Amino acid sequence: IRFAANQVEEDCPQAERAGVNLNIYWAFAEGFIQRTAAALTQAEADTLGLSCFALACELATRFLDDYLLGDKYFKIKDSLHNLTRTRCQIALAQDMQRKMAAMNAIARDCWERYKTAE
């Protein structure tokens, strides 16, 4: 989600353009929950949006850490590449936070439709 549903590339210089595309998030949630409903608990479905937010924050931290430690882990295009990635992931996480109610509603709708289908 942090990659596929982001409205921009992960290294877009205009970080403020980063954000979650709810249509793509819906497609992901639909497919994921449909295939895992038999094993998925309601609590897990209810935290699907939060898990996407957490992953965006975690990756922002990893990009920033790599930048501060001299760009040893991630392949970079230039000396600010990981810093640019950090900013995009933070902007994505902020947008997810703003849209969390919608993300939760999407996951809940999918859960309700598929919890007994398996």
Q: What are the residue ranges of the model-derived segments?
A:
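General structural signal for secondary-structure boundaries
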Residues: N21, T41-Q42, Q97-M100
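Active-site activation/catalytic loop segments of kinase-like enzymes and analogous catalytic loops
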Residues: I1-A39, A54-F74
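Short, structured coil/loop segments at alpha-helix boundaries
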Residues: A38-T41, N104
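Sparse, context-dependent recognition of short Cys/His-centered cofactor- or disulfide-binding micro-motifs
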Residues: I33, G49, D78-H81
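ATP/Mg2+ or Mg2+-diphosphate-binding catalytic cores
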Residues: E58-E118
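All-alpha amphipathic helical-bundle segments outside canonical DNA-binding/catalytic cores
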Residues: L40-C52
